UniProtKB/Swiss-Prot annotation:
Keywords: Electron transport, Membrane, Mitochondrion, NAD, Respiratory chain, Translocase, Transmembrane, Transmembrane helix, Transport, Ubiquinone. It is a multi-pass membrane protein. Belongs to the complex I subunit 4 family. The keyword Transferase does not apply. Its EC number is 7.1.1.2. One of its GO terms (cellular component) is mitochondrial membrane. Its main location: mitochondrion. It is an enzyme of class 7 (translocase). It is found in: Mitochondrion membrane. One of its GO terms (molecular function) is NADH dehydrogenase (ubiquinone) activity. It comes from the Eukaryota. This is NADH-ubiquinone oxidoreductase chain 4.
Amino acid sequence: MFISVLLILFALCVTLIPEAHYHMVRVWSFVATIIPMWVVTWMWWNFDASGHGLQMLVILGRSHLAFGIDGVALSLMLLTTVLFPICMMLLRTVAGFMTFILLEVLVLSALCVLDLLGFYILFEASLILLFLLIGRAPYGSLEAAYKIVLYTMAGSLVLLPTLFMIYSECGTTNVLYMTCAYNHQTVLGWGLLAVLAVKIPLMPVHLWLPEAHVAAPTAGSVLLAGVLLKLGGIGFLRFMLPVVPEFCVSVFPLVSTLCLVSFLFSTLSTLRQIDLKKIVAYSSIAHMSMVTLAIFSQSEFSAYSSSFLMIAHGLISPALFLIVGILYDRAHTKFILYFSGLGASMPIGSTLFFLFTLGNLAFPLFPNFIAEVLCMVSIFAVHELLAYVFCVCQVLGAAYGFWAFNRVVHGLPRGPADVTRTEFHTVLPLLIGAVWLGIKPMA
């Protein structure tokens, strides 16, 4: 809560600076995203990892609006505060600075809010900024922006009346005090599943994500893959499993089928894409499908494995979008057919592309490897056949990853310049974080 207030104050300070002083606006905006990172680092240092349940609880008066963190939320908050300064280095407009500061306020608040209605409001408010970010980008698309709104609002219209019904029955929407009878669990469970399946996303409500990534600027794609998709995962872990546990057990066959179809379809779709951003976007759908299935398995390692995969994906996928953005700045295209021989003209960029491609394919020494192994263990505990099918589908993931890398890096060189110092520094923290988590996952 303190971080959100601090960011709002910084946003107000930035608005008082004349636009003519662009450099000062950029510096203050960057500082506005650095300070929350230090605050969250202090929270990490003082967090009791051996304890269970929520810590650092803050309850606002009689409204029962509560904020608190657990290990999953704190890890995602740390990831969020690392990604936002990187995005600030990519922005060039004052409106973009303000949009990203406000978006960080909404995301950090959503990660630590304990009220279902509050989560819903913050969740939907982030869509407004995402709509502006995608619809008004230099090469943005209003069609993609409207797609996001239509898909998400369809799920939200199911959840909102359900929340009012639950509030009339329980007198609160705070997860600390909510108790739902089984008949209410069914109604609330379907509402939550409808809205979170769009956000994470699962088939058949996934089509907005590739279009959004293609239309968004590089900074928008970094946040969408690294942070905003994780709101669906935190919604499942914090609100759905504790509030409607019996519904989650009864709906597991349906969810597991959706996850399997989403994983298989997104992987096969990736093999036929020619847009580099769509390749990374469809791979994100595959990873988040595995996250969802691990969560609903409710085995001993399900919470840890799913949250670890979200964090690993939040490091690897944004880095791939950064590299695609670097290639776009050189060639002004994202189509894979126009790239060739970058290994000769961009040795540093090609090396980074190779390393993060390995990370995306769950190669050892990267956190995706540990996370996906733990997810497989969680799935094996409840359904062995399903786990075997997921293991076989992983081979397709290796196929599209190496095909894209081979097409871009090898062949006759076409001469784009290598990465600049600033571009290298935007990717370097993600590489360090990914390798560190891959070597020391319990840190």
